[in-house]
Each structure stands twice: as C-alpha cells, then as structure tokens.
C-alpha cells in the first residue's frame, strides 16, 4: 500500500498556503462515487482493456486542441459524461462537467502553455487498468513552456517546465465519469524559482501553533 501526500492541501488545511488561490473548488476530494475502488474479484481483461482504450482515445483527441482547431476537435461529449467530476490537486481545485473543467482548468492551463503535448520524446506515460478504473503515470509525463499568462498567477517567463503526475479515471456506461489528477505542484513552482516551502515558513513565522479544540492553525 502506497500513500500520496498532497502537501499543498496540508498547507491549506493549516491556513498556511503561500501562493495563488485555486480557480477550482478546494475541498476534501472523495473516492469513487460508486465506492468500489478496491477490487477484490478476478481481473477482467476485456473490461479493463476497453476502459483503458477509451481513456487513451480521449487523451489523443484532447491533445488535438489547440494545434488542430477549436474545442470541438477534442470531441469531449464522445468520451466524457456531461457531468463528469474532475478532481484536481490542491492549488488547482476541482470542477464538474465539461464546461466546469474547461473554465476552471483547461482554458487557463492551455492559454498559458499552448505548446502542451509537443514534446513527446521528453516525457513518458505508463497506462494500466482494472475493470472500470484506468491510471497513468509519468515522471515526467508532460512538458511545455509558460509563454502566456493565466495559470496559477505565474508570470509568462518563457520557462519550459515538466509536470510529474499520477492520474486516475473511472469509466461508467462507456463514458469517463470521474477523473482524479495528482500533479506535483511544488515541483512546478521549484522549476520557476519559487520555493513554496520557504515562502510558507516566511509567511507564517509569527504564528504560535494550533487551537487544541478546532485543530486550526493560529
């Protein structure tokens, strides 16, 4: 069993996050709505392969935008449930539905880094699936240049960065219903010369501790 710590969320819970506010909703991200993420039965290769192929096709179409045209080239209604839940990491936040996903994550993300997906030789992606669940990881699995404004309040300094992430999807009735996206944001900030942990210490050095009744940082 492995544990993935979302350190920015820990900072937020302590009211000590030192960087920009999230565009999406910040909350305690839930597990699968179907509560069946721990699979104990036999591995179903056919269902797993179908789920994995759906997600991989969805990603292929998403990378067509914006190089090959407007949002329509992604054909999102073909792959994504209209009210799918997109759970981003703390610092980005969560969104619901195609419009919510685009408004609160995709549009500012691609506007700031329009060369997303143009450096496949510099990244890796390892997909695996079981039943309706699909996952991918790469260290890194994205590379792009912050050439425009609009993402996380970062100034467009033409800095090329990589993103290390672990993504999960849940497929339901042939559509992606939930998507968990874990991005190492502290590493992103480090690449542009921002030490988030040092900023946290500097901004919070006068605080005295925690309220024993509420657990809130003072």
Model-assigned labels for residue ranges:
Residues 1-218:
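C-terminal and inter-domain tail/linker signature
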């Amino acid at each position: 069993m492995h544990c993935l710590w979302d350190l920015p969320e820990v900072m937020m819970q302590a009211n000590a996050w030192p960087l920009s506010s999230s565009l999406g909703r910040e909350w305690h991200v839930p597990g699968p709505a179907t509560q069946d993420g721990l699979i104990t039965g036999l591995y179903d290769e056919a269902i797993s392969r179908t789920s994995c192929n759906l997600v991989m096709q969805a990603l292929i179409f998403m990378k067509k935008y914006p190089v090959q045209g407007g949002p329509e080239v992604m054909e999102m209604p073909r792959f994504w449930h209209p009210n799918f839940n997109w759970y981003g990491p703390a610092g980005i936040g969560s969104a619901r539905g195609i419009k919510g996903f685009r408004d609160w994550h995709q549009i500012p993300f691609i506007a700031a880094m329009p060369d997303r997906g143009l450096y496949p030789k510099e990244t890796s992606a390892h997909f695996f699936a079981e039943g309706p669940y699909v996952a991918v990881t790469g260290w890194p699995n994205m590379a792009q240049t912050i050439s425009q404004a609009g993402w996380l309040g970062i100034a467009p300094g033409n800095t090329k960065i990589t993103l290390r992430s672990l993504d999960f999807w849940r497929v339901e009735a042939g559509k992606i219903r939930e998507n968990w996206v874990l991005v190492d944001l502290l590493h992103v900030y480090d690449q542009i010369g921002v030490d988030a942990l040092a900023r946290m210490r500097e901004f919070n050095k006068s605080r005295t501790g925690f309220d024993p009744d509420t657990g809130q940082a003072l």
